[in-house]
């Protein structure tokens, strides 16, 4: 998204001024809303925030700061609207084409307007030591900020289950250590979705969820037609969509419609003025509603029925597992040294976890170094050499490594979600036994523990789109609520339309959840967190390379500590840590 807000980056920019923004959900939600409304990024509004905080003499962002910020941004927007068209910015001097360096010619279009102040090669720090040995592109400059970072290995957050014990964690286990992929794999081809098959799959999914809702709520005896004018109460179900007559309005309470599960895909507008309970809606959500349609124009909804999460499968009680997770990018956006990944692998060699999960992007399209004229290898060769380095570094360990691409940012896969695993050519074929290549999303099982992973940022996408109304809104855990949608909707990406280009046929087939996973690794740009939700634990480690530092996650599971009792989850017997690299 062009107008994103990232709390960690925002605080990094505020830190030099001695200011900070607390990681409170309603603050984050407000700042995200301001960025989207005024078409700015988090970095764009830093100066405005600093100005407001300096004027008010405050060190920490609060509701008053945000209110004043919104007032200032609104004033700026009005000023822009009323600026006469005849007032033009003075033209900047242009550099004649013959005088432009190769660096400028190969850069962004904006670079031709800027004088070149880049450092000479002799002033650029070079990779050294094991960072040089590890880098798949030895000609990359070093990341000096990473080498000088503060608080390496600092624990950002910890969750310790009430029955977790360190004792016996490294002991032998009788359970099967084989990783079994239980989710479907998308096609390596794309663009061949048949409309009739997609419609049939959507209709079947709506019917399945409606059946689960009906089983959970005895008052729903039968489904009716909500488009027929009547004073009688009707129960119906369907998919939440943005009212097509209000496309110019932001998705919300007054721009919601329901697409009915009939042959015509009938759309009925919904009015929630009679609703007294909490409302949570997003496009693509499948719900049931109760209401009346006296005029035939819109359904006056007085109750919403949400499906419950699927049950969690049992696990083997003698299981001990150390699972690590990291999400790309794995190097800074202006180099190709992969120092962050090298450092992580050094820790893996030292501590030897059972599983290391690495989610993309590996070759990031946002990496500006890949556009430099000095970068003279193909993206595929860069990926191949990087994964070979990963394999070589972990020789002698028993750590199983899982590799997952990111369709929206990895340059070595088609930009279509769900994403098939990286294609293995001759180089990668040599290491297919050492590295496990999986799709995005993927669910696998080991010793009965079901683990889901995705790099597509569904929770971030829901955060950008979801409408929620509650009398107790400030005291509700927003991230937990967003995470719960994946479980109740039985889908690893329940938002429709998606924020990433998608194959609807594969999405409906591959993203389905047959049971609630015990663990879900779903990184986002939101603040790092670990949340227990509906019998599962959602872990957001953020990214491994983020400015001068980054984060990764460790999870230790010890079911030798006792037998899993009814109502308990794997999280009760686990310790989760999110650490800085």
From Swiss-Prot:
Protein origin, superkingdom: Eukaryota
Biological processes, Gene Ontology terms: DNA replication initiation
Disruption phenotype: Delayed cell divisions/cytokinesis. Dysfunctional development of intestinal and pharyngeal cells. Mislocalization of p-granules to the nuclei at the 4- and 12-cell embryonic growth stages. Loss of cell polarity during cell divisions.
GO molecular-function term, one example from the UniProt record: DNA binding
Location(s), subcellular: Nucleus
Keywords (A to Z) from UniProt: DNA replication, Nucleus
Entry GO CC: alpha DNA polymerase:primase complex
Function: May play an essential role at the early stage of chromosomal DNA replication by coupling the polymerase alpha/primase complex to the cellular replication machinery. Required for the distribution of pie-1 in cell divsion.
Family: Belongs to the DNA polymerase alpha subunit B family.
UniProt subunit comment: DNA polymerase alpha:primase is a four subunit enzyme complex, which is assembled throughout the cell cycle, and consists of the two DNA polymerase subunits A and B, and the DNA primase large and small subunits. Subunit B binds to subunit A.
PANTHER family to which the protein is assigned, alphabetical: DNA POLYMERASE 2 ALPHA 70 KDA SUBUNIT, DNA POLYMERASE ALPHA SUBUNIT B
Name of the protein described by the UniProt record: DNA polymerase alpha subunit B
Organism (species): Caenorhabditis elegans
Phylogenetic classification of the source organism: Eukaryota, Metazoa, Ecdysozoa, Nematoda, Chromadorea
